[in-house]
Amino acid sequence: MKVTFEQLKAAFNRVLISRGVDSETANACAEMFARTTESGVYSHGVNRFPRFIQQLENGDIIPDAQPKRITSLGAIEQWDAQRSIGNLTAKKMMDRAIELAADHGIGLVALRNANHWMRGGSYGWQAAEKGYIGICWTNSIAVMPPWGAKECRIGTNPLIVAIPSTPITMVDMSMSMFSYGMLEVNRLAGRQLPVDGGFDDEGNLTKEPGVIEKNRRILPMGYWKGSGMSIVLDMIATLLSDGASVAEVTQDNSDEYGISQIFIAIEVDKLIDGPTRDAKLQRIMDYVTTAERADENQAIRLPGHEFTTLLAENRRNGITVDDSVWAKIQAL
């Protein structure tokens, strides 16, 4: 089905206010969920909203909490999210990293005691729109087996890198082949995954999203490489924030909350003039996209460039929402 941005935001806002969230916070949170969905990231927008409300009702998320600065070391700051609303706090933390970068050339904010930030790409994009390189990542509860194991002991720990090119170039990727959100999107659409995304119960690689959702044997991106990246990203976020690791979140908490996150902004214009920056970026993009195609009907893509098109299409034609997901939200 199709809905407008206004319908989507109003539905989110209604549910948040009915759960006791104050009107200003509810409006800002609803706006972010709706913008994420409008951008085409349904897995971490509309599809994730019922799960967000579940955690709000369980007390994992404290809606009136505000992040608090703990330590300041020039370009580096350490903050405690105090289990505040994840997407609103993440936006504030990237804003703070940008402020630090404006003074120092680079800014790094390490955040502990945080909640799920929904679409991580929003915060990299936020920096790139202002002309900064944006880098951020988060740890999570253990939802992926390390390479060679059957039991979940590491997080998908998504990493975002956004570059202020025209259009913005951005990688937004979990350390698994697919996020659990994208497994859900494909299952709801009745689709197999385009490539293997995990193991079935017999230990064979599979493209069936429902099987992987059930047995949790999701495949690390690049096999052992994604497994290793997940571990070191967790270590860095834990150390810099003095926060909880994947092990601590999984073993000590009843659900995924109290996680650790990193936000980095780099002011490129302190290092290179604007025309030179633009020319270098354009040469890179042109060199990549003019490579001989393996399939004449399939264009060579640059990461993140599709979001500009998706956003325009959703604004023109309405936002596609799965019927069952919309029914869940209406019932909240």
UniProtKB/Swiss-Prot annotation:
Localization per record: Cytoplasm
Which reactions fall under this protein's catalytic activity? Answer: 3-dehydro-L-gulonate + NAD(+) = 2,3-dioxo-L-gulonate + NADH + H(+); 3-dehydro-L-gulonate + NADP(+) = 2,3-dioxo-L-gulonate + NADPH + H(+)
Keywords annotated in UniProt: Cytoplasm, NAD, Oxidoreductase
Which GO terms of the cellular component aspect does the record hold? cytoplasm
* GO molecular function terms noted in the UniProt entry: 3-dehydro-L-gulonate 2-dehydrogenase activity; NAD+ binding
**InterPro entries in the record, alphabetically?**
Diketo_gul_Rdtase (IPR023689), Mal/L-sulf/L-lact_DH-like_ah (IPR043144), Mal/L-sulf/L-lact_DH-like_NADP (IPR043143), Mal/L-sulfo/L-lacto_DH-like_sf (IPR036111), Malate/L-lactate_DH-like (IPR003767)
Membrane-crossing residue ranges in chain numbering: none
Q: Which PANTHER family match?
A: 2,3-DIKETO-L-GULONATE REDUCTASE (PTHR11091:SF3), OXIDOREDUCTASE-RELATED (PTHR11091)
Q: Which family does it belong to?
A: Belongs to the LDH2/MDH2 oxidoreductase family. DlgD subfamily.
Q: What does this protein do?
A: Catalyzes the reduction of 2,3-diketo-L-gulonate in the presence of NADH, to form 3-keto-L-gulonate.
- State how it assembles: Homodimer.
| Protein name (database record) | 2,3-diketo-L-gulonate reductase
Protein species of origin: Escherichia coli O139:H28 (strain E24377A / ETEC)
Tell me the gene name: dlgD
